[in-house]
Design a protein with these regions (language model features):
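DNA target-recognition patches
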Residues: 13-16, 26-59
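Amphipathic alpha-helical segments with low aromatic content
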Residues: 1-8, 149-175
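A short beta-sheet element
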Residues: 41-43, 51-117
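Catalytic core of tubulin tyrosine ligase-like
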Residues: 122
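Non-catalytic DNA-recognition/assembly elements of restriction-modification systems
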Residues: 1-22, 47
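Histone-fold recognition with a strong bias for associated Lys/Arg-rich disordered tails
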Residues: 28, 141-142, 173
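A short glycine-rich beta-alpha junction/loop motif
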Residues: 77, 91-98, 129-152
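Short, solvent-exposed loop/turn positions at domain surfaces
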Residues: 1-3, 26, 61-62, 129
Length: 175
């Protein structure tokens, strides 16, 4: 694929809204439900797109949790840096995760998801030394990424989405 336009460097905070997750009090059982929206923790991140989580927020829990829309890219920023996913539906997440809700008029969510591995590599390299690696919301917002035009983002995003779907299909195929 040849690119027609030059790529531009942008800070993640310029691409949309950055949200740090939170944990509604686990001592209030009414905040959680078997049929609520996903509430993602790093251990729930095992696919490129997340539709399920071990715990879900009830309607009441959604009033306390930080709820974001479908296509928000979730990036772990504490301890297990490098586990990234995109929400397949409206959801919420804990404080170990930052979410980027992209301005979809300018940025392709799946393209950004593919780029998120590069963000994680940068975060691992610059995370605070010590027993626990942490990249705070401000540092996350300041991370830079390279972006082609929206049309090219969409083409790249569609290519990788198709490739990821093919890989998933082959992984599920019995031997």
């Amino acid at each position: 694929m040849a690119f027609k336009y030059p790529w531009e460097q942008r800070k993640l905070g310029e691409l949309g809204t950055i949200t740090t997750g939170n944990t509604p009090s686990t001592s209030i059982t009414d905040y959680y439900s078997d049929d609520g929206i996903v509430w993602v923790t790093p251990t729930d991140i095992c696919e490129n797109i997340t539709f399920e989580s071990a715990r879900k927020l009830s309607d009441l829990g959604q009033q306390v949790g930080r709820v974001v829309p479908k296509n928000t890219i979730l990036v772990t920023c504490i301890a297990s840096i490098g586990k990234n996913t995109m929400l397949g539906n409206t959801g919420s997440f804990n404080q170990q995760i930052n979410g980027l809700t992209p301005n979809e008029n300018k940025y392709d969510p799946y393209f950004l998801l593919t780029e998120s591995a590069l963000w994680s590599a940068k975060m691992k390299g610059s995370a605070a030394a010590g027993t626990m690696q942490i990249v705070n919301r401000t540092e996350f917002s300041e991370l830079k990424t390279w972006l082609p035009s929206l049309i090219e983002q969409q083409a790249i995003g569609a290519f990788f989405k198709q490739l990821d779907n093919l890989i998933t299909l082959h992984q599920r195929k019995p031997l």
